[in-house]
């Protein structure tokens, strides 16, 4: 290991993998990636096998194993948050669902002063650069065809998927061929980061192919304990590996630790709310009260049904069948283990006052919780549902100068009347769809929440008890102009306001969370950041039309 690098990237997760690969494309750049977790070994079935996605969570070999402080509006429940502590970060342990969000998300990002380069037209070319979309035709102007992230469409060929899509139509919605294309609104097959029966993590797609370069070095099990400074200029980092402390210098340091670790390290380094830092004996370096604030996440629940016909994937949870399923995957990369099973779903508006979808549905032809707890039924299916734009906000604060002490954080789920109202709408919409005739041949009755949950108050009480994080923490170091006191990162450079040689590139800089899973937007931001950091001309914006309710015909872009 050298004593000095041009760039040190803290975190070998989703954003860090993109940055390590792209920045080291310039042979003149010496790049060091520091990852606190271990490597994502190619033989590790719990990472590489798509259907094993439920097993890394809660396992210290893969997961930081975070949890919130008691959520004040969920009867004091602590909500567990799995975050990838392994090369590839959360892209090595997530559900592999690829969703860009709605184009209007980026139109809203671009509205504040200084944010105009973040509209959909400016983001679209970076989405396309990262994608290799096997489910799109070569002339599809919305999708990329030559990027490192290989995407499988569907296939959603289990009969329960088609019945669910048809039920959505019967409930008054539409089918869409591609939720990442012209029209997000509607029901249809999803893209997943699965190729040839194997997970496509950011590290597998970006970092591993680049690691043969002499100017890129990746250190795993390297826990960064502090940033080093001369005044307000970052000069390098100190990290611990195998019990030994190392200090390395850099022209620039890039934080890509994610929405929990990046604000934590900033606060440990004296960058945050001055009063809070002083209370812990940390001398403030710069007062940035937005560090750790504006914290957003998606909360979700499972609406589960028993299935009357033996067509669900429920038998695959039988431990007696797992060895055969595993051998099918090991020797052929096929069978039940070769899919994440989140092969379809939909996006809808919960009422006519909403301009674009505010509810997301993931459909599963199986009834099982994310922790592996299966429903009491021989066969079953479920939808994961939750509001996408909750106006509840949380915060993250370190509670010690010790970098190994986990920070306190809370999301304040269900803290506003608007949030609660959307939750009631979400459950009613889900029940309406699941109660349609298209599902009658399979519908063996609701398991969860169950028929005893009917009134608005009962629904909210159930969400308090049963809601889980969708694992989309974001916005804790949000970007915005320096004139915005609560912004942390400059939107044109990703540099931390008031600091030199320090940038943040990960989910924490999102100004608002997007509609859907957030891994794709994080990759997009990292692709764009890499061009900015390298001094390259940004990709030209692509101004193409996309579906907007009330502007286009209600059936525009749909399929039968």
UniProtKB/Swiss-Prot annotation:
The keyword Heme does not apply. It comes from the Bacteria. Its EC number is 1.1.99.1, 1.2.1.8. FAD binds at residues 6-35. Pathway: Amine and polyamine biosynthesis; betaine biosynthesis via choline pathway; betaine aldehyde from choline (cytochrome c reductase route): step 1/1. The active site is at 472 (proton acceptor). Keywords: FAD, Flavoprotein, NAD, Oxidoreductase. It catalyses: choline + A = betaine aldehyde + AH2; betaine aldehyde + NAD(+) + H2O = glycine betaine + NADH + 2 H(+). InterPro entries: BetA (IPR011533), FAD/NAD-bd_sf (IPR036188), GMC_OxRdtase (IPR012132), GMC_OxRdtase_N (IPR000172), GMC_OxRtase_C (IPR007867). Transmembrane segments: none annotated. GO terms for biological process: glycine betaine biosynthetic process from choline. GO terms for cellular component: membrane. HAMAP family: Choline_dehydrogen. Belongs to the GMC oxidoreductase family. Involved in the biosynthesis of the osmoprotectant glycine betaine. Catalyzes the oxidation of choline to betaine aldehyde and betaine aldehyde to glycine betaine at the same rate. This is Oxygen-dependent choline dehydrogenase. The gene is betA.
């Amino acid at each position: 290991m050298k004593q000095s690098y041009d760039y040190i990237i803290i975190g070998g997760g989703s954003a860090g993998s993109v940055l390590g690969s792209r920045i080291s494309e310039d042979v003149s750049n010496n790049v060091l990636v520091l990852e606190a977790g271990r490597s994502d070994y190619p033989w590790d079935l719990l990472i590489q096998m798509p259907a094993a996605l439920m097993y890394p969570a809660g396992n210290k070999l893969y997961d930081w194993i975070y949890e919130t402080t008691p959520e004040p509006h969920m009867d004091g429940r602590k909500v567990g948050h799995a975050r990838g502590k392994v090369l590839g970060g959360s892209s090595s342990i997530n559900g592999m669902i690829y969703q860009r969000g709605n184009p209007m998300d980026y139109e809203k990002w671009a509205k504040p002063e200084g944010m105009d380069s973040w509209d959909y037209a400016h983001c679209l070319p970076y989405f396309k650069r990262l994608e290799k979309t096997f489910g799109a035709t070569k002339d599809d102007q919305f999708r990329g065809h030559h990027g490192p992230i290989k995407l499988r469409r569907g296939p959603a060929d289990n009969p329960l998927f088609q019945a669910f899509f048809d039920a959505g139509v019967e409930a008054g919605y539409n089918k869409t061929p591609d939720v990442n294309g012209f029209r997000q609104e509607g029901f249809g097959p999803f893209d997943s980061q699965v190729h040839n029966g194997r997970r496509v993590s950011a590290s597998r797609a970006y970092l591993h192919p680049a690691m043969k370069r002499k100017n890129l070095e990746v250190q795993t099990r390297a826990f960064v304990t502090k940033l080093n400074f001369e005044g307000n200029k970052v000069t390098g980092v100190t990290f611990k590996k195998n019990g030994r402390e190392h200090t390395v210098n850099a022209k620039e340091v890039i934080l890509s630790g994610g929405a929990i670790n990046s604000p934590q390290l900033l606060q440990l380094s004296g960058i945050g709310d001055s009063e809070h830092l002083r209370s812990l004996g940390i001398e403030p370096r710069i007062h940035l009260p937005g560090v750790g604030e504006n914290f957003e996440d998606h909360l979700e629940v499972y609406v589960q049904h028993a299935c009357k016909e033996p067509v669900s994937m429920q038998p695959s949870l039988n431990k007696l069948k797992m060895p055969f399923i595993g051998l099918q995957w090991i020797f052929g990369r096929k069978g039940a283990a070769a899919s994440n099973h989140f092969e379809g779903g939909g996006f809808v508006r919960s009422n006519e006052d909403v301009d674009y979808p505010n509810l997301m549905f993931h459909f599963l032809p199986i009834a099982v919780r994310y922790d592996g707890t299966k429903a009491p039924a021989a066969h079953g299916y479920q939808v994961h549902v939750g509001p996408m734009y909750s106006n509840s906000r949380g915060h993250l604060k370190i509670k010690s100068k010790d970098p190994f002490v986990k920070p306190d954080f809370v999301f304040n789920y269900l803290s506003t009347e608007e949030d609660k109202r959307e939750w009631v709408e979400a459950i009613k919409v889900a029940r309406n769809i699941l109660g349609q005739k298209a599902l009658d041949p399979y519908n063996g009755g609701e398991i969860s929440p169950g028929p005893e949950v009917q009134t608005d108050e009962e629904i909210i009480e159930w969400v308090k008890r049963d809601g889980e994080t969708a694992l989309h923490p974001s916005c804790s170091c949000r970007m915005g102009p320096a004139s915005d006191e609560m912004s942390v990162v400059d939107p044109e450079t990703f540099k931390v306001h008031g600091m030199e040689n320090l940038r943040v590139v990960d989910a924490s800089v999102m100004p608002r969370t997007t509609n859907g899973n957030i891994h794709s937007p994080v990759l997009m931001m990292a692709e764009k950041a890499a061009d900015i950091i390298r001094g390259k001309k940004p990709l030209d914006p692509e101004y193409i039309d996309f579906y907007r309710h009330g502007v286009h015909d209600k059936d525009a872009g749909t399929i039968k």
